[in-house]
From Swiss-Prot:
Family assignment from sequence similarity: Belongs to the glycosyl hydrolase 30 family.
pH profile of the protein: Optimum pH is 4.5.
PANTHER family attached to this UniProt entry: GLUCOSYLCERAMIDASE, LYSOSOMAL ACID GLUCOSYLCERAMIDASE
Keyword Glycoprotein appears in the UniProt entry: yes
EC assignment: 3.2.1.75
Record's keyword terms, sorted: Glycoprotein, Glycosidase, Hydrolase, Secreted, Signal
Residues at the catalytic site: 241 (proton donor), 337 (nucleophile)
Organism: Aspergillus fumigatus (strain ATCC MYA-4609 / CBS 101355 / FGSC A1100 / Af293)
Leader peptide range in chain numbering: 1-17
Subcellular location: Secreted
Top-level EC class: hydrolase
Name recorded for this polypeptide: Endo-1,6-beta-D-glucanase neg1
């Protein structure tokens, strides 16, 4: 739907009112598959067992004492691609401000984690580019480094978002190094030797280092250029989906041992020498190869304290994150990419947010934040033609899509600094129906419980807190419902 400024002011007033109410009593908000609930206030849960009447019932438990404390929330959000920036910049200043308030402020979704593309991705208009293409000719001094119009627009958009959301964490990920740094010499269109020319593949790291140093300095220059435009880059991954290569658009293989050595010997030291506090997150790919980030941590743990995961494994299994946590308890984890196609199930965004949170993820980012009405702009070759943004821009206005509301059921009520709590009782049957839940202790002392109901009927849910309280209320059919409970 289109959101007017008047409606936004009304929502802002509601936000302030409900914030005051939460201090003394419980509240509940819901978004559902039918679209008649969109972060809508519904009947609040009551203390005790309540009265389920003839409804189905479900029992959940939450350990809201110190023994139940798990990971700390960093934030939720999406990918800021060239498609996002291009589409957003077609809006008038007032409409864009209205939209960004809906995305970045507590009155809206309160997004606080944005992953942006360093150069082109599949969601860029033609032609594909990096920040130092140099006409395809080698530029070992990086004298041709330039953000260009699209990189500059990206940095300015992120800076504007940061001005609205002081807690915003910005993660940058490249889809490829400049073509001249690669063994095949091209940015896209060729999967043969689609690897960085860094010496590790051609000489096992004992001979020529190729362009490893230049690749490291490329990150330094990019981070400094963004900082100069007001966008502090909090973290990078050194390659998006490093085990994937495709002809037609920018991709690049970076193997696990190669990633580890690039970080340990080049990128980590380069960032440190430049006085940059930007973190390096390992991997940025699917859950089916956990040995990859483990190798990086084992060999480059001096510079890597976080791991990024995607959702595209044939059988995505978020418990991999719990297993990884058990081996690496001091390492933060994030779900940094999962797409939201228009044809996807209503609960797709809820699923790829809920599962990682239940398994030690500190943040979740969807693919992508915004697109135009044609799910673009995207590259004509290799571009994603079915990647719908959380927001669709059309004819000078915008539509907040289902995935936006499903993610906001988490992000709006689990702010940065919230502590995820241990819980039990979540279950989904083979037919797809079930109840999934995650809870948090928030910085202001309130507690949040997010309940995803994929059944075709309402369910009366009772949550038993280890602190001694019991809360009960309705979770409407095919919905995500968020309870905000007062301090224990």
């Amino acid at each position: 739907m289109r959101i007017s400024v008047g409606a936004l002011l009304g929502l802002t007033a509601l936000s302030h009112a409900t914030t005051e109410k939460r201090a003394a009593s419980a509240s509940a908000y819901c978004s559902n598959s039918a679209g008649n609930y969109k972060l809508s206030s519904i009947a609040a849960p009551v203390q005790g067992a309540g009265n389920p009447g003839s409804e189905s019932t479900w029992q959940l438990t939450v350990d809201d004492t110190s023994s139940g404390h798990k990971q700390t929330i960093v934030g939720f959000g999406a990918a800021v691609t060239d498609a996002t920036v291009t589409s957003f910049n077609t809006l008038s200043a007032s409409v864009l401000q209205d939209l960004l308030n809906k995305l970045m402020t507590p009155a809206g979704a309160n997004f606080a984690l944005m992953r942006h593309t360093i150069g082109a991705s599949d969601l860029s208009g033609d032609p594909a580019y990096t920040y130092d293409d140099n006409g395809g000719k080698a530029d070992p001094s990086l004298s041709g480094f330039n953000l260009g119009d699209r990189g500059t627009a990206m940095a300015k958009m992120l800076a504007t978002m940061k001005s609205l959301q002081p807690n915003l964490k910005i993660l940058g990920s490249p889809w490829s190094a400049p073509g001249w740094m690669k063994l095949n010499g091209v940015l896209d269109g060729n999967t043969n030797n689609n690897n960085l020319n860094d010496g590790y593949l051609t000489s096992g790291g004992t001979g020529s280092t190729g362009y490893a140093s230049q690749f490291a300095q490329y990150f330094v220059k990019y981070i400094q250029a963004y900082k100069n435009l007001g966008a502090h880059v909090d973290a990078i991954t050194i390659q998006n989906e490093p085990l994937f290569s495709s002809a037609g658009y920018p991709t690049m293989y970076v193997y696990d041992y190669e990633s580890a050595q690039l970080i340990q010997n080049y990128i980590g030291p380069a960032l440190a020498s430049a006085g940059l506090d930007t973190e390096i997150w390992a991997y940025d790919h699917n859950t089916d190869v956990p040995s990859y980030p483990q190798t990086v941590l084992n060999q480059a743990g001096q510079y890597v304290k976080s791991v990024a995961w995607h959702c595209y494994a044939p059988n995505v299994d978020w418990t991999v994150l719990s297993q990884f946590h058990n081996t690496n308890p001091g390492v933060k984890q994030y779900m940094t990419e999962c797409w939201t196609p228009a044809s996807g199930a209503w609960h797709q965004a809820a699923d790829f947010t809920m599962g990682p949170l239940q398994n030690w993820a500190s943040g979740v980012a969807a693919w992508t934040l915004g697109t135009n009405a044609q799910d673009g702009p995207h590259l004509s070759t290799g571009g994603c033609a079915t990647c719908q943004g959380l927001v669709t821009i059309n004819n000078g206005g915008y539509t907040l899509n289902t995935a936006y509301y499903m993610m906001a059921q988490f992000s709006k009520f689990m702010p940065p600094g919230a502590i995820v709590l241990n819980g039990s009782g979540s279950y989904t049957y083979s037919g797809g129906g079930g109840i999934q839940s995650v809870a948090s202790l928030n910085p202001d002392g309130t507690r949040t419980v997010v309940i995803e109901n994929t059944f075709g009927n309402d369910v009366y849910v009772t949550v038993t807190m280890k602190s001694g309280q019991k809360w009960s209320g309705n979770a409407p059919s095919q919905s995500v419902t968020t309870w905000v409970l007062p301090s224990a």
